[in-house]
Each structure stands twice: as structure tokens, then as C-alpha cells.
Amino acid sequence: MKAMQAKIPRALATGSRMVCSDNTGARLVEVVSVDRYHGVRRRQPCLGLGDVATVSVKKGTPDMRRKLEKAVVIRQKKEIRRPNGIRLSFEDNAMVLINERGEPKGTEIKGAVPREIAERFPKIASMATTIV
């Protein structure tokens, strides 16, 4: 996985509910666990922009609900800082469902996607409407 240039704060914890910003049929997802997180005892696992997590689909089509899926965070409200000094934040926290190889399950992504995600997940970038 490619390293990110920007300073990404881990602002989302397990149990956070986020909008699913693709057309897979899931509308609201809840973070169950964070992949590749090796923490300290009793510390709540946190995730930020570009992190992959296991999520439970809470709202959506009947065939998608109550399933565990992999997802990546594509937007977060907490601002990120780029090396040139620009600070970037979004209006919502959003995720996109992915498969085991890191490719998106849907065929369309709603909303803007930051450049850091475009570098790490090129397939998500090709489907995004706007890259910021």
C-alpha cells in the first residue's frame, strides 16, 4: 500500500457510523474493526482517511443489510494537512465498499475524493466524480 504524503489524523473510531458513498446498495455502515491495527491494551482502534476497515451494513437494500464487508474511508470531517500547508476537510464522513484486492465493489462514487485516496486506490479515483 502506498504511503500518504499528507498528515492524516485518525479521527474515526470503531462504532462510528458513516455514509456509504457508492452504488452497492449500502447506505449506512458501522465500523466493526480496523484492518492492520496493532494497538495498545484497552485503546480504542481508530482510523482515518485511506484506512481499510471491516464494516457492518446498517441501512440499505435487504440483500446488503446485516453483512460484514471491507471498506475504505474516502472522506472525513476532521481536516487533513498537506505538505504545502493546505488544510482539507469535508462535510461528511464517507466510505466505499471494496473487495479483498482493494477494488471498489460499486461502479459509481458520489461526491469528491481527495488526491491522497486517488494515489493509494487508483480504481476508486477512476470512478470518482471529483478529485480534490
Swiss-Prot record:
SMART domains: Ribosomal_L14. GO terms for cellular component: cytosolic large ribosomal subunit. Coiled coil: none annotated. It comes from the Archaea. The keyword Ribonucleoprotein applies. One of its GO terms (biological process) is translation. Keywords: Ribonucleoprotein, Ribosomal protein, RNA-binding, rRNA-binding. The keyword rRNA-binding applies. One of its GO terms (molecular function) is large ribosomal subunit rRNA binding. Part of the 50S ribosomal subunit. Forms a cluster with proteins L3 and L24e, part of which may contact the 16S rRNA in 2 intersubunit bridges. HAMAP family: Ribosomal_uL14 (MF_01367). Binds to 23S rRNA. Forms part of two intersubunit bridges in the 70S ribosome. Belongs to the universal ribosomal protein uL14 family. This is Large ribosomal subunit protein uL14. The lineage of its organism: Archaea, Methanobacteriati, Methanobacteriota, Stenosarchaea group, Methanomicrobia. The gene is rpl14.
